[in-house]
């Protein structure tokens, strides 16, 4: 389960001084479930927007850790000091997550699951997991790397 509340309890501040809680006031927003716009060099594992909660969690954790490890290696090898998802990439990923889930039981109007944030009164109701499957998710992550970490800003 996404522990959005756990991340929000830690006073992690982004480059503009906003906390994650402030950044996510309208719901969690990530690129691939791995990074948050405005929080360079901060990686999340099994975050909202990833398929982790709908798969064997260990498989997803392993893929996330491998991807992050390879990414950090790439940053070091290329003397890149910061990586951050572009806001448009986050928007596009969230749109894709919702398009893939559209019409599924997960997004049915009668669904009151934590997948939609229904477990916490007042929490924004947005769909969080990627239902496209672990294989497709891995392919997308690999394509992003092959395209030079498309959707990310790399700063030297």
Stretches found by the model and what they are:
Residues 1-2:
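Short, small-residue-biased leader/transition segments that mark boundaries at the very start
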Residues 5-8, 54:
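Short glycine-/acidic-enriched loop or helix-start segments at secondary-structure transitions
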Residues 7, 39, 111:
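Active-site lining segments that contact anionic ligands and/or coordinate catalytic metals
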Residues 8-14, 43-47:
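Catalytic cores of eukaryotic secretory-pathway lumenal/extracellular enzymes that build
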Residues 14-21:
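N-terminal low-complexity, intrinsically disordered segments
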Residues 25-31:
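Alpha-helical scaffolding within the catalytic cores
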Residues 30, 43-156:
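C-terminal, flexible cofactor-proximal segment of oxidoreductases
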Residues 32-38:
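Short glycine/proline-enriched loop/turn "hinge" motifs that connect secondary-structure elements
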């Amino acid at each position: 389960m996404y522990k959005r509340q756990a991340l929000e309890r830690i006073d992690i501040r982004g480059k503009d001084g906003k906390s994650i809680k402030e950044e996510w006031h309208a719901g969690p927003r990530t690129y691939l479930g791995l990074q948050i716009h405005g929080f360079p060099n901060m990686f999340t594992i099994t975050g909202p927007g990833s398929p982790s909660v709908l798969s064997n969690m260990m498989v997803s954790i392993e893929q996330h850790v491998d991807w992050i490890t390879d990414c950090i290696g790439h940053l070091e090898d290329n003397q890149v000091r910061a990586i951050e998802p572009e806001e448009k990439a986050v928007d596009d990923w969230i749109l894709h997550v919702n398009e893939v889930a559209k019409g599924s039981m997960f997004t049915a109007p009668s669904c009151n699951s934590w997948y939609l944030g229904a477990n916490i009164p007042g929490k924004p109701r947005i769909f969080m997991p990627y239902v496209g499957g672990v294989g497709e998710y891995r392919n997308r992550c690999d394509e992003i790397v092959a395209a030079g970490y498309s959707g990310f800003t790399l700063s030297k």
